[in-house]
């Protein structure tokens, strides 16, 4: 049976550069690529050497997604939850849904387009 791994997720945002800057600050990611999309629009890829988010935009991308559309949320693990929350707040976004549970802690935030993100930190380095 084949074994797989998530390589990337492509999401539509109104301002890829703004979203990329937040993800680079929040996660220590780098820009991997940017350019014209295959058919129309523009994309930037941010991530690490193994996986990434493709941040796509085009004239038809308006943002203001409803909860659960186009997806429920995207989750990331970090090694410094307080530092991550400060970065989110400094970007003018509002952290919410804080929870301390076994085995970790988390919070959520909506980006400028209404996309929900979860930020998690696990005790003992189990990420």
Predicted region positions:
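Exposed loop/turn and edge beta-strand positions of beta-sandwich/beta-sheet ligand-binding modules
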Residues: 40, 70, 103
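Conserved beta-strand in the GNAT
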Residues: 54-56, 118
